[in-house]
Amino acid sequence: MFAVVKASGFQRLVEVGSVISIDPTNVDSGGFVHFPVLLLVDGAEVVSDPDKLRLARVSAKFLRKLRGPKVRIHKFKNKTGYHKRQGHRQGVYVFSVTSIERGD
């Protein structure tokens, strides 16, 4: 069974056991979160009806916090000698999908 969920403003294709990385949310260590389901695929059956999807539920367990790759920003202005370097690393939370329930 597959599901498309909305997580941190992005759509992710998940199945039970898959690991996803998203932007930080409010969750405790070892806690569970539930993602809204946008599409559900169970074998040959595809569920896209919003009324049925409100009952569906995808649960994921929080695994760990990570930091993403370093992004380097360099501002430069010609002929003035002005330049500025700056770096940024975005925080990332890693979740493992534990269950996908249809809610029928």
Curated annotation (Swiss-Prot):
<comment type="similarity">
    <text>Belongs to the bacterial ribosomal protein bL21 family.</text>
</comment>
<dbReference type="GO" id="GO:0003735">
    <property type="term" value="F:structural constituent of ribosome"/>
</dbReference>
<dbReference type="InterPro" id="IPR001787">
    <property type="entry name" value="Ribosomal_bL21"/>
</dbReference>
<comment type="function">
    <text>This protein binds to 23S rRNA in the presence of protein L20.</text>
</comment>
<keyword id="KW-0699">rRNA-binding</keyword>
<dbReference type="GO" id="GO:1990904">
    <property type="term" value="C:ribonucleoprotein complex"/>
</dbReference>
<keyword id="KW-0689">Ribosomal protein</keyword>
<comment type="subunit">
    <text>Part of the 50S ribosomal subunit. Contacts protein L20.</text>
</comment>
<dbReference type="GO" id="GO:0005840">
    <property type="term" value="C:ribosome"/>
</dbReference>
<protein>
    <recommendedName>
        <fullName>Large ribosomal subunit protein bL21</fullName>
    </recommendedName>
</protein>
<keyword id="KW-0687">Ribonucleoprotein</keyword>
<dbReference type="GO" id="GO:0005737">
    <property type="term" value="C:cytoplasm"/>
</dbReference>
<dbReference type="Pfam" id="PF00829">
    <property type="entry name" value="Ribosomal_L21p"/>
</dbReference>
<dbReference type="InterPro" id="IPR028909">
    <property type="entry name" value="bL21-like"/>
</dbReference>
<dbReference type="GO" id="GO:0006412">
    <property type="term" value="P:translation"/>
</dbReference>
<dbReference type="GO" id="GO:0019843">
    <property type="term" value="F:rRNA binding"/>
</dbReference>
<dbReference type="InterPro" id="IPR036164">
    <property type="entry name" value="bL21-like_sf"/>
</dbReference>
<keyword id="KW-0694">RNA-binding</keyword>
